[in-house]
C-alpha cells in the first residue's frame, strides 16, 4: 500500500497534507497486487486445477508470460523455468481501498463516486538509497493493454514516483 500522493504545487489529492486525520485516505481505491504460481499457467502440468482450460491459459489476462516475450535474446538453461514470474496489479477505481473511510462520495450500491478522481498505489523501498552509484539507470515496465476488448474505453494515468 502506498501513502497518499503528494505534490507541493498543484496537489491532485489535497488530503495528503492531513496528518493523523481519517480523511487522509478518502480517495484511495482498491489496488490488488499478486503473482500467480506457475502451476496454474503451465498447459502441460498435471497439477493444474481441472477448471482451468487451455483457453483460459491463452487469454491475455490470465496466461503466463514467457521469458522469450520480454527477453528474446536471453539463453535459458535446460532446468530453467521458461515462465517469467510477474507482479500483477489490478486497479478497481469504483471499490473502496484500505483506510478509505469516505462516507460522502459513495453511491447507493456501495461503489465509490467519481472513479476518475481515485487513485491506488504500491510502494517499496529500493536498496541502496544512492541509485546513481549503484548504476540504476532506468525502470523496465511491461503493461498489458487493459482495453484489449474495448478500444473506445477511456484510460487512466500511470505515475512512477521515485522519491
Language model features with spans:
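Surface-exposed, low-hydrophobicity segments enriched in Gly/Pro/acidic/Ser residues
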Residues: 1-163
Amino acid at each position: 500500500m502506498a501513502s497518499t500522493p503528494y505534490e507541493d504545487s498543484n496537489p491532485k489529492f489535497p488530503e495528503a497534507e492531513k496528518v493523523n486525520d481519517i480523511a487522509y485516505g478518502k480517495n484511495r481505491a482498491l489496488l490488488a497486487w499478486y503473482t500467480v504460481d506457475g502451476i496454474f499457467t503451465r498447459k502441460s502440468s498435471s497439477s493444474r486445477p481441472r477448471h482451468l482450460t487451455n483457453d483460459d491459459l491463452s487469454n491475455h489476462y490470465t496466461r503466463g508470460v514467457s521469458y522469450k516475450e520480454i527477453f528474446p535474446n536471453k539463453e535459458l538453461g535446460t532446468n530453467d523455468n521458461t515462465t517469467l514470474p510477474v507482479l500483477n496489479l489490478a486497479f478497481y477505481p469504483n471499490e473502496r481501498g484500505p483506510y478509505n473511510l469516505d462516507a460522502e462520495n459513495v453511491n447507493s450500491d456501495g461503489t465509490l463516486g467519481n472513479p476518475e478522481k481515485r487513485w491506488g498505489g504500491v510502494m517499496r523501498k529500493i536498496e541502496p538509497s544512492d541509485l546513481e552509484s549503484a548504476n540504476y539507470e532506468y525502470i523496465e515496465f511491461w503493461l498489458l493493454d487493459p482495453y484489449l476488448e474495448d478500444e473506445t474505453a477511456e484510460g487512466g494515468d500511470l505515475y512512477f514516483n521515485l522519491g
